[in-house]
Amino acid sequence: METPNPSAMEVNLETDQQVQSKDKPQRTELKRGLSARHMQMIAIGGAIGTGLFVASGATISTAGPGGALAAYAVIGLMVLLLMQSLGEMSAHMPVAGSFQTYATRFVSPSFGFAMGWNYWFNWAITVAAELVASGLVMSYWLPDVPSWVWAISFLVLLTVLNALSARVYGEAEFWFALIKVITVVIFLISGTLMIFGIFNDSPGVQNWTAGDAPFHGGFLAIISVFMIAGFSFQGTELVGVAAGESSNPRHDVPRAIKTVFWRIMFFYIGAIAIIGTLIPYTDPNLLRDSASDIAYSPFTLVFERMGVAAAAAVMNAVILTAILSAGNSGLYASTRMLHSMALSGQAPRFFGKVTSHGVPIYAMLATSAVGALGFVAALVSEDTAYTWLLNVSGLSGFIVWLGIAACHWRFRRAYVKQGRSLDELPYKAPFFPFGPILAFTMCLIVLLGQNYEAVFRGQLLQVASSYIGLPIFLLIWLGYHLVKKDRTVSLDEMDVEGVTITPEEA
């Protein structure tokens, strides 16, 4: 990690004057310090976390091993198409605002405004959620220490990591992600050996045929698991945000899109298959999907059956790493999003100021403060206010994915209509126009069907709690449109000019 000089925290007050027009690719003082290995691990680390280590057991319990596999495979296909769309735009136009900038330029300023604030709030509240989870995890070892002590300690750690430079963030995320990857690889190898009876008697395929397996609950159960699977994959879009500080985005972004996704899918599909084979879906421990129930993580259960005495302690440490990784990435992503909006006039302009190391310091401190307030809300509200905050941000990732598909659809059409050659693009999404259309449709189905049971039962409070994020997004979009009286950018007028990386930036 690089060590900042004494002036590292000196704020550069020239940022705004050095930024181009908001209708052009933005030149900022962000430093392109993320290497290819950073980009690879940011993409991997964004998708491997508590969704795999903890919540995967609940998906098998709900839909059976076959249903869980089907759900993750379908959501994985959707994410592949979305990441191909994002990769095409990010390699051509690598800016820290990513899809917020694309939404503003390829759809309308009001859509970009809503996308940006939606994404910023999502990750700011995610930081708060990870602070809450960190206290639960640490209580495994030190139950007498108040959770707020750990929350403050980890918030300070994450703030310092993000305050130094993008390279320090990338280095921290590289090692966080590497720990998670090593854990999954060991799990896959050990689980495979167990299936073949190396450590104990093999269960064979009996857990795939017991009861109404492999598709417990039928089609509706698979639909209900889609949302859990979708949440598990959220964070893969971080590679688009990080492209704005990649040292070689034309090469590193396509490489991350092409290779990392398949590794992630291998990890998820392999882990679900092993858990479903070794643990029956009727095991009540699979239903416990809270970070505080680490002894019942499906990974812990499998390692214990292998004879690892300290399985719970080991997995607790890994999950703490996953929590810190998510908080680290959340603070980074939301900071860059707020910074980008400030430069385009969609947030207070002082959030565009950066330090001499290229860190949007005011945007980062504001995001840290919101994360801290979210944690306080969880402490004092007996989870009521905090739960609603989580629900508001819960749909944000899916809304962003919808926006990515819509932006790519319009970008490619405008690019071709303006007479440009697709050969000039550093990376071309291979399944256009089928890809973004299918991804948009699938994502919309998952978003609207996330709590269909409450809708059918007429449970209005649960419906409002589950879907509140969607009307808030639409109100922000409509409100900005009414105030600014903007319009949808036509294909002929759309600015699809790419971003050229100068030697000074690289």
What are these language model-derived features?
Residues 23-30, 69, 142, 146, ...:
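Helix-loop-helix junctions that connect adjacent transmembrane segments
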Residues 95, 118-133, 228-246, 309-349, ...:
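Membrane-helix boundary/coupling elements in multi-pass transport proteins
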Residues 135, 148-203, 234, 257-265, ...:
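Membrane-interface loop-to-helix entry segments
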Residues 101, 108, 140, 225, ...:
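TM-loop-TM module centered on a large, flexible mid-protein loop between adjacent transmembrane helices
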Residues 30-31, 55-150, 154, 160, ...:
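Extracellular loop-to-transmembrane helix junctions
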